[in-house]
Amino acid sequence: MQKYEKLEKIGEGTYGTVFKAKNRDTHEIVALKRVRLDDDDEGVPSSALREICLLKELKHKNIVRLHDVLHSDKKLTLVFEFCDQDLKKYFDSCNGDLDPEIVKSFMYQLLKGLAFCHSRNVLHRDLKPQNLLINRNGELKLADFGLARAFGIPVRCYSAEVVTLWYRPPDVLFGAKLYSTSIDMWSAGCIFAELANAGRPLFPGNDVDDQLKRIFRLLGTPTEEQWPAMTKLPDYKPYPMYPATMSLVNVVPKLNATGRDLLQNLLKCNPVQRICADEALQHPYFADFCPP
């Protein structure tokens, strides 16, 4: 740790405290994540270390770079590139108004980061505005990729904040244990709607039951035909048969017709029907978009 000088505490992440720090040799500003482990007596599980070391190979401009892994006497500190703010803070500063072109740019960058990681069989599993970081150049980067697999997703953060269910798909809420890339695509859909509404969450549920009700009230309760595997999921229980909202115009009024179509393809209750990141990048919504 002598290599890095702590400058200030940035906040509490899902896995522990995050500090802004400076590399004493290069003077580069970095973010240090001290990972607190539940079973501190055991030290760092070797499986977690293996997973984390794989993440150092994820090099893409829309992924927060993991520079270094510092492992000493039962402590694990991850050294990441530093970004100025997360999407949640960005929303707070934009006063309920977000330019449609910025929405499109952020969504494109989010999908680019997802496509890259998914092509390497790395899932995020806990995407939310707090782990989408934005630097001074308006570049969006996905943080905490792969950490869920290495450490599991705790029920509570270390700041005692409950880990949010707002971005979880119905299959996961019904107890699905076999995750695929579709879990991240649902989260991307929720974030897309939140971008379009300048920071208003789409499904701000209070618990699993409320979360599923909010989803089904908007999208319609899936039938056995629409989602055959649903009733076999471990925590499945029947819900009232809500009809689907005919149009998303009132839900995301500032999103154009092609944007609403992309959103509908991301928010499919049946994970098999959800669009993948590569397909989403080819969607007509991005036809007139010129990546920087």
Swiss-Prot record:
The keyword Lipid metabolism does not apply. It is a peripheral membrane protein. GO terms for biological process: axonogenesis; cell division; neuron apoptotic process; neuron differentiation; neuron projection development; positive regulation of neuron apoptotic process; regulation of cell cycle phase transition; regulation of dendritic spine morphogenesis. The active site is at residue 126. Residues 4-286 form the Protein kinase domain. It catalyses: L-seryl-[protein] + ATP = O-phospho-L-seryl-[protein] + ADP + H(+); L-threonyl-[protein] + ATP = O-phospho-L-threonyl-[protein] + ADP + H(+). The modification N6-acetyllysine is found at residue 56. Its main location: nucleus. The modification Phosphothreonine is found at residues 14, 17. ATP binds at residues 10-18, 33. Its EC number is 2.7.11.1. The modification Phosphotyrosine is found at residues 15, 239. One of its GO terms (cellular component) is perikaryon. The modification Phosphoserine is found at residues 46, 72, 159. Keywords: Acetylation, ATP-binding, Biological rhythms, Cell cycle, Cell division, Cell membrane, Cell projection, Cytoplasm, Kinase, Membrane, Neurogenesis, Nucleotide-binding, Nucleus, Phosphoprotein, Serine/threonine-protein kinase, Synapse, Transferase. The keyword Cell cycle applies. InterPro entries: CDK (IPR050108), Kinase-like_dom_sf (IPR011009), Prot_kinase_dom (IPR000719), Protein_kinase_ATP_BS (IPR017441), Ser/Thr_kinase_AS (IPR008271). It is found in: Nucleus; Cytoplasm; Cell membrane; Perikaryon. PROSITE patterns: PROTEIN_KINASE_ATP, PROTEIN_KINASE_DOM, PROTEIN_KINASE_ST. GO terms for molecular function: acetylcholine receptor activator activity; ATP binding; cyclin-dependent protein serine/threonine kinase activity; ErbB-2 class receptor binding; ErbB-3 class receptor binding; kinase activity; protein serine kinase activity; protein serine/threonine kinase activity. Belongs to the protein kinase superfamily. CMGC Ser/Thr protein kinase family. CDC2/CDKX subfamily. Proline-directed serine/threonine-protein kinase essential for neuronal cell cycle arrest and differentiation and may be involved in apoptotic cell death in neuronal diseases by triggering abortive cell cycle re-entry. Interacts with D1 and D3-type G1 cyclins. Regulates several neuronal development and physiological processes including neuronal survival, migration and differentiation, axonal and neurite growth, synaptogenesis, oligodendrocyte differentiation, synaptic plasticity and neurotransmission, by phosphorylating key proteins. This is Cyclin-dependent-like kinase 5. It comes from Xenopus laevis.
